[in-house]
Amino acid sequence: MGKVKALQRLLTRSFSGKALAVRRVTENQGKNTPGVDKVTWNTPQKKINAVYSLRQRDYHPQPLRRIYIPKKNGKRRALGIPTMKDRSMQAIYLLALDPVAETTADPNSYGFRPQRSTADAIEQCFTALGNIYSAQWILEGDIKSCFDGISHEWLLAHIPMEKPYSGNV
C-alpha cells in the first residue's frame, strides 16, 4: 500500500488534481446551488482562486445547508448541501479513493459505480441466466436507509488513505 498512498498524496496535493475537482464541481448539475456560505464559483477568476484555496492542512468542513424536497408519497426528504469548497474537497478525496475502491469492488455490482449503467446490469443478468449451470433466479434488493447504519469508524480504519486527511472524510 506504500505506492498507493504515495500516489494518493501526489494526486490530492497536485494543482491538476485540485483543478479537476473544481471543474467537476463547477460543471455539474448543482453548480449554481450554494451551501451555507452562499458562495458559488461561477466565473473563471473564482474557479482559479478556488483551485489555489484547496488545501488539506487546516481544512474543516462547513455545516450543510439543509433543504427538504417532496417525495412521491407526500413526505419530505432532507437534503444536505455542502459548500463549493467542501464539494471540491470531497471530489479530491474521490479521485484518490475511487481507483482503490474499483479494484476491490464486486464486479457484479452496478449501483453508483462509474462507467456502469442499468443496461450493463441487465446484460449481466442475461449472461448469467444463459449459462447452463447458472442459478434460475436473480434477486434485486433495496436496503432502506442503508447509509444511516454504515460505521464511519470501520470505513476510516479499512480504507487506505493518508491519516492526516482521513479525519476529514
Language model features by range: what are they?
Residues M1-V169:
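Non-catalytic terminal/accessory segments
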